[in-house]
Amino acid sequence: MNQSYFNLLGNITWLWMNSPLHKEWSCELLARNVIPAIENEQYMLLIDDGIPVAYCSWADLNLENEVKYIKDISSLTLEEWQSGDRRWIIDWVAPFGHSQLLYKKMCQKYPDMIVRSIRFQPNQKSVGKISYFKGGKLDKKTAKKRFDTYQEELATALKNEFNFIKK
């Protein structure tokens, strides 16, 4: 670890502290979510005039780790962050109104990707919603086909994991 690593960690921590949602989360969760992103270079940090304004991180999961993540968002190990090709946004922090710019930059960097996230509202931290996003160059028909495939695979895996009984 060097000075730039700690500067990066400090910038991201500062953004977390300024986010209404993230500032309530523990240091342990910050470490679990941020350190693997830095070590695997799976993040984007936007800086404006020397000040961090937005950050996101992602993990590329296999189906097994995707199910594990949905069951417990703090469960991923460092190695699991790069276990497959099913991209999940782990953190999205833009406390100063730069969310749209971050979205645009991610679409430019990954124009052909399908990305999912579990979104939480500050007043409902125990209930998350899975959201889907597509890269800027991915046409709607192809994106929908991929969305549907991912959804079907995930639903089947979750059904098998929880042993749901069909009535």
Swiss-Prot record:
Q: Tell me its EC number(s), please.
A: 2.3.1.-
Q: Name one GO cellular component term.
A: cytoplasm
Give the Gene Ontology MF terms in alphabetical order: acyltransferase activity
Q: Which UniProt keywords apply?
A: Acyltransferase, Cytolysis, Cytoplasm, Hemolysis, Transferase
Q: What class of enzyme is it?
A: transferase
Sorted alphabetically, the Gene Ontology BP terms of this entry are: killing of cells of another organism; toxin metabolic process
**Which residues are the active-site ones?**
H22, D91
Q: Which domain of life is it from?
A: Bacteria
Describe the reaction catalysed, as an equation: a fatty acyl-[ACP] + L-lysyl-[protein] = N(6)-(fatty acyl)-L-lysyl-[protein] + holo-[ACP] + H(+)
Asked if Glycosyltransferase is a keyword of the record, the answer is no
Instruction: List locations, semicolon-separated.
Output: Cytoplasm
Which InterPro entries is this protein grouped with?
RTX_toxin-activating_protC_bac (IPR003996)
Check the record and name the Pfam families matching this protein: HlyC
Q: Function of this protein?
A: Involved in fatty acylation of the protoxin (LktA) at two internal lysine residues, thereby converting it to the active toxin.
Give the protein family. Belongs to the RTX toxin acyltransferase family.
List the protein's name. Leukotoxin-activating lysine-acyltransferase LktC serotype A11
Protein source organism = Mannheimia haemolytica (Pasteurella haemolytica)
- This chain is encoded by the gene named lktC
